[in-house]
Amino acid sequence: MFKKLIDKHKKYVYHRINKMALFATIGLLGVGLVYSAKNLYTHQDNQVSIKKSFYLNKKEVRQKLIHEIDVPRILPRLKSEEEKQAESRKKYLNATITYLTEENKKAAKHTKTKKVQKTNTKRNLDKAVSKSTNAKAVKSHEVVATAYTAFCSTGCTGKTRTGYDVSNTSYYNGKRIIAVDPEVIPLYSLVQVSYEGNSFQAYAIDTGGDIKNNRIDILMDSEQEANAFGRKNVRVSW
């Protein structure tokens, strides 16, 4: 009997527990559904606000672009061909025309005559200078030429009257050396010596006791060359 009571009580407790678990499960499901619905509505509100903000910004951007397009831009206007031709005709018609009067003609003639006279004067001066130069260039003398060496039995020192050492050479700046009478041919003159179809240039940088008037002495490298030259009539130009 006690066993039956206990079994009956167990069945009652078991059914009671199952019923409570069922109610608890239903309650939890209801709470979950309510919470999910609330989150869904909140998410939809956020989506609507984002879309609204986006479309508002898009509208503002469109209005800004339309405003910029509507602003007039001032560009330089290009002139047409007719306007350019009209300006050219206007400049041509407004140009100042200068007529030659008698006074202007006289002034122009006077200026031209003065310029011609000045040019002719310059040409005459150039010709005079050229003639003077040519006259100096063709100055020449017929002289008697002999030859000498740097060392001789009468006490030659190996130097010219101007102090140039000729102990090892008979040339000065690539030209021959001659002794002259400074009263006839100035010292340091570059002269042209011509004789018997021969011609050479020489510097007059030496003098001699016997070299007077129309006499010159040509420096040679050796006594043999000096003796071979001997005595000749030559023309000296400077």
Swiss-Prot record:
Name a single GO cellular component.
Answer: outer membrane
By its UniProt entry, which Pfam families does this protein fall under? 3D
Keyword Signal recorded: yes
Q: Which SUPFAM superfamilies match?
A: Barwin-like endoglucanases
Question: Per its UniProt record, what CDD domains does this chain match?
Answer: 3D_containing_proteins
**Annotated region (Disordered), positions in chain:** 111-132
| Leader sequence segment | 1-37
Annotated GO biological process:
peptidoglycan turnover
Keywords, sorted A to Z = Signal
A single GO molecular-function term is:
hydrolase activity, hydrolyzing O-glycosyl compounds
Where is the sequence biased in composition, kind Basic residues?
A: 111-121
Coiled-coil ranges (or none): none
- Asked whether the keyword DNA repair is assigned, the reply is no
Q: Which PANTHER family match?
A: CELL WALL-BINDING PROTEIN YOCH (PTHR39160:SF6)
Q: What is this protein called?
A: SPbeta prophage-derived uncharacterized protein YorM
Q: Which gene encodes it?
A: yorM
